[in-house]
Curated annotation (Swiss-Prot):
This is Adenylosuccinate synthetase 2, chloroplastic. SMART domains: Adenylsucc_synt. Belongs to the adenylosuccinate synthetase family. Gene3D superfamilies: Adenylosuccinate Synthetase, subunit A, domain 1, Adenylosuccinate Synthetase, subunit A, domain 2, Adenylosuccinate Synthetase, subunit A, domain 3. Plays an important role in the de novo pathway and in the salvage pathway of purine nucleotide biosynthesis. Catalyzes the first committed step in the biosynthesis of AMP from IMP. The lineage of its organism: Eukaryota, Viridiplantae, Streptophyta, Embryophyta, Tracheophyta. It comes from Capsicum frutescens (Cayenne pepper). GO terms for molecular function: adenylosuccinate synthase activity; GTP binding; magnesium ion binding. PROSITE patterns: ADENYLOSUCCIN_SYN_2. IMP binds at residues 88-91, 113-116, 205, 219, 300, 315, 379. Homodimer.
Amino acid sequence: MNMSALTFNSTPMITTATATDDRSRILGYNGTHSCSRLSRKKNPSIMACSTTKPLAPVVDHHGVNESGLSRIESLSQVSGVLGCQSGDEGKGKLVDMLARHFDIVARCQGGANAGHTIYNSEGKKFLLHLVPSGILNEGTTCVIGNGVVVHLPGLFKEIDGLESNGVSSQGRILVSDRAHLLFDFHQEIDGLREAELAKSFIGTTKRGIGPCYSSKVIRNGIRVSDLRHMDTFSQKLDLLLSDAAARFPDFKYGGPDMLKEEVERYKKFAERLEPFVTDTVHFINGAISQKKKILVEGSQATMLDIDFGTYPFVTSSSSVAGGICTGLGIAPRVVGDLVGVVKAYTTRVGSGPFPTEITGKVGDFLRSAGQEFGNITGRPRRCGWLDIVAVRYCCQINGFASLNLSKLDLLSDLSKIQLGVTYRLPDGSILNSFPSDLHLLEHIKVKYEVLPGWLSDISSIRKYSDLPKAAREYVERIEELVGVPIHYIGIGPGRDAFLYK
């Protein structure tokens, strides 16, 4: 494939990168045009930011123009943002932007296996795992719902990091008393479980998510409300630790001494957590009655859902629309508009089938330019063309009212872009649905449509109509194939790098 590289003209504020000729060589350089994106070394915790002001016109409403404001204000009282691929789509950025127009932002499932990256108005990067992405907006209350599994040391570390950067959490973060506690030992046995699976490993984040949900399902888990009863907490924790030791010989339970130490630790945690603990079911339903606007922030994505994802290479919770009701305790009839977030190409971290995966120069380029390394593990993400079959399947399950197409700017270097539009079986017949059979999925052939690239920097554009014709054709072809309108388009990491269609 013939691709064109960029001439770099930005002044980096924080970066470990250098602009070298390597990128031009890799991309088969044959022309010049300007762009502010840098080729960066693998370091997912560092982001290059330009000190130059954007070329976009100044707009009101915190960077949202009139068209965007109309889109946002039309969203229903209870709306949601969910992943439409395999995670890492950019949900946090959309939630951060929408949160300014909502009273409450709520997490309904998952745990610290989420990694949502957002930026404040000064361009400072925040990586959130448990705290909802609405936290940077002072008027927003952030709810951690009953469906979330909460690792208290991680939560407090996150809160401390926010506080040290001037972001107050006092009175703004509510933790469900029904949420289950994720302990350090859950993380340890998560790793032991992966070691047991050997070559069949799932590729978890080793954050203890699966073991904690397992404790919940077999009904010996410990909930946040149990911290109010430390007289029985010790007995419950002893049962959990004993079960882990019986199941995993390599897990060393130190008996009474270890138990006593852990109980004392959680007594301190309980005292600190108490101001945050709330009956969030009562709180959210009360807010609905008071006509407050609520935005639900999904974590992971549909293709990682425990039921509808590429099982067993999935997460341990319901990351589709149905998880909103079970994870927050609200009725299905109150859930309104859902926005699916779709990256302009496809990525996946960890194991599992990947029909449109790209190997070689193009895949390496997308990984490097897009900083495609897992927010949790730092593992390089696998990259591929946009899989229309999978996206259509996700839209069918969730009933998305609209989509957010993120990272469109990352395709600006490509002279040709492919869309995976059809799955074909080995015998040549068309597969009309996304298969549950992974063996079948690994052997399907993908039929592609090839679209022209636009080979120009779009990161400073702020009106959809100003996009190059080829970029608009790419967006509109996705809409045609999927059958869901794209209302939001991400064209860079910054808060204002958004287009409204």
